[in-house]
Structure formats: C-alpha cells, structure tokens
Amino acid sequence: MDRNQRPRSILDSLGEELIAILTPVSICMFTVVLLVCILNSDPSSSSASFSSIATAAYSESDSDSSWDKFVGALLNSVVFVAAITVATFVLVLLFYLRCVKFLKFYMGFSAFIVLGNLGGEILVLLIDRFRFPIDSITFLILLFNFSVVGVFAVFMSKFSILITQGYLVWIGVLVAYFFTLLPEWTTWVLLVALALYDIAAVLLPVGPLRLLVEMAISRDEDIPALVYEARPVIRNDSRSVQRRVWREQRSSQNNANRNEVRVVESAEVEEEHVGSSERAEISVPLIDRRPEQAENSETFLEGIGLGSSGAIKLGLGDFIFYSVLVGRAAMYDLMTVYACYLAIIAGLGITLMLLSVYQKALPALPVSIMLGVVFYFLARLLLEVFVVQCSSNLVMF
C-alpha cells in the first residue's frame, strides 16, 4: 500500500453514509405523517384530551391570546427541558456508581412500556379506524409477544441488525406520534428549546451527555441507550478487500505485546500484499466485533457519532423530534410537509459533513430543527400564498 496515500475520510463515502442513515429517518417521518393523516386530521380535538409533563405548566386554549400562548408554551418548554436535564444527570450519577445493570433494566422496561402501552393505543385506534376484526385476547397476546421480542431485539446483540433497526424505528414512531398531539404553540417552542438543549448537553464541558460519553470512554464501557446504528459501508472489489488497518509503531524499548496504536484508518489492502518494515500493518475485517479495541465505541443518547464498526450512530431522540416536526406540519398541509422534510434532510447532511470534519459526537437536532422550523413558517406564510395565487390565476393548477 502506498504510504503517501491520503487516509480515507468519511467524505469519500458520504453518499452511502447518507443513505444508510437517511433511509430509517425518512421511514420514521413518513410513518408518523401517515398516522397523523389517518388518526387525527383534526388537531384541535386530539390536543385537548392529551396531557403530559410537556403541558404541566400551561394548558393551551383557543380563547387565549397569541402572547399568552407563547408565554405558556415557553413555560412548558422550560419545565420539560428541566425534567430532561435532571433525568440525564441522574443517569450520569447511576453510570458513575456503576449501576449498569439497573440502567439496562430501566431502558428495557421503558422500551416495553412504549411498545406495549403506546403501541397498543395506536393499534386500537387503527383497528377501530379500519374495522379490523380481532378479539381482545388474541390482540393482547400478540401485543405482549411483540413487545417482549422488541425489548430483547433492542438490548441483545444476538438478534439480526434489521430486526433491531426496525424496532428502534417503530419506537421512534410511537413516541413521535404522541408528541404531535401536544398543543401547536407548545410543540414549536419545545422543538426549538430541545435543539438548544442538545447543543449544551453535547458540546459544553459540563453537559450531561458529554459527561456520559467521556466517562464511557475512560471506563471502556457502553452506555445503555436507544441508539440507531447504521450498517457500515463495505465496498466489494474483485482485486482487493476492504480492511481496517491498525498501524502499530513497534518500539525497541517495549515488548511486542505493548505496541502503541498510532493510526486507525479504513483502506483497501491487496490480499497478496504483506508489509515488511518497522511499521507493521495488521489488517482485520471492517466490521469489528470487539468494541473494546475501538476508540469511539461509546453509545450516544442523542446526537450523531461514529460507532466502533465505522457505522454512523444517531440517537433515537433525533428520530423522534424530526418526526414530530413533519407530523405537526402534516396537520396543516402536505406542501408544508415536503418543505420541512427537505429542510430536515439538508440539516442532517450538514451535520454529517461536520461529523466528517470534527470526528466526534455532535448534536444532530440544532441544524435540522432550525431549518425545519424556518421552512415551516416560510411555507405557511409565503409559499402557500404564492401557490394559491398562481392556481387562482391559472398559472399553475
């Protein structure tokens, strides 16, 4: 291999990496939009009966003024973000105290509740909507089995990666759909507040998510979390095999078992080629099943990063709030949905490019959410007026 060759960057395969992460994100958003269009075409009726911690400080009413709605939505967002911050710091404390088994049990129980409770509610609504004949006992048995399998698929690595990815996307769909039932003003202010929180939690030195990641790196442990990991990009070539090459600088002062790892890169190594110099090259398959050898083997709760296998990891919270944005837009019209979807995809692409430059965990919400919110209001205030005027004057129809 040519030693002067530039190390392979994620920019060289940005197209495949984008598809690997944009496909599940798009499926999640499309499913939420579909559920919104089927189940609650009238947002006012569904919002009034739905309450959660996101509406603890203020309950929006149609008779309230716009200023009152904004202030109330701001209070709701502060309460919600504060609750998330406290919960995340509790998670940091438990991880610091090495209560990993308890965290895994808690995450598994949470996944079971989401699949069983929220999933059951949505399935009941769909059954009622389409008049599907099924008895309650059969429904409960199927729902229980589906939820149990989902918990094991998400938190046990022996399952197929496609099954795990499918369950993660479905969990994101369930949570996102119920977030779309929040009042309109609360939804938009909450999305902006969560984007700002994501920046602080991931990038600030005292951010809870950054503390978790640094602690996991220092201990060489995984954080129990709901994280979507895309498959790594593997290129097939008739003459070469893609490998991860660990270059070790052998030192005469140390024995062979304590070599210092200098560079970790993906390269195409000829199968016949065997290096013979002071710098030894050990090639291993690109999909490495030994996470303890990787420097970036941590699991991110939110944000975007690179896993030990070279695959991109995206927190399930990002799936959820992307889908909340387009789901809320679907309550207005589909033209706004298209605009918000393109804005989110563009923001995610920008975030992936930043990831390729900085090579560390980055918040995935800010760029996409900000672009999505801006495009939503531009579509409602400008694009709709333009399209209506063009249609009424037969310029387009």
Swiss-Prot record:
GO cellular-component terms in the record?
A: endoplasmic reticulum membrane; Golgi membrane; Golgi-associated vesicle; intracellular membrane-bounded organelle
Keyword line: Endoplasmic reticulum, Golgi apparatus, Membrane, Notch signaling pathway, Transmembrane, Transmembrane helix
Topological region Lumenal: 39-76, 128-135, 180-188, 327-336
Which pairs of Cys residues are joined through disulfide bonds in the record? none
Q: Where in the cell is it found?
A: Endoplasmic reticulum membrane; Golgi apparatus membrane
Could you tell me the membrane topology recorded for this protein? Answer: Multi-pass membrane protein
| Intramembrane residue ranges | 367-387
Q: Where is this motif: PAL?
A: 363-365
GO BP term, example: Notch signaling pathway
Task: Please tell me whether the keyword ATP-binding is annotated for this protein.
Answer: no
Transmembrane stretches, start-end: 18-38, 77-97, 107-127, 136-156, 159-179, 189-209, 306-326, 337-357
Q: Which residues lie on this side of the membrane: Cytoplasmic?
A: 1-17, 98-106, 157-158, 210-305, 358-366, 388-397
Q: Which Pfam families match?
A: Presenilin
Residues annotated as the enzyme's active site: 198, 318
UniProt-listed InterPro entries: Peptidase_A22A, Preselin/SPP, Presenilin_C
**Entry annotated with the keyword ATP-binding:** no
Molecular function terms from GO: aspartic endopeptidase activity, intramembrane cleaving
Q: Which family does it belong to?
A: Belongs to the peptidase A22A family.
Its quaternary organisation is: Homodimer. Probable component of the gamma-secretase complex, a complex composed of a presenilin homodimer, nicastrin, APH1 and PEN2.
Comment text on domains: The PAL motif is required for normal active site conformation.
- Sum up the protein's function in the record's words: Probable subunit of the gamma-secretase complex, an endoprotease complex that catalyzes the intramembrane cleavage of integral membrane proteins such as Notch receptors.
What name does this protein carry? Presenilin-like protein At2g29900
Annotated source species: Arabidopsis thaliana (Mouse-ear cress)
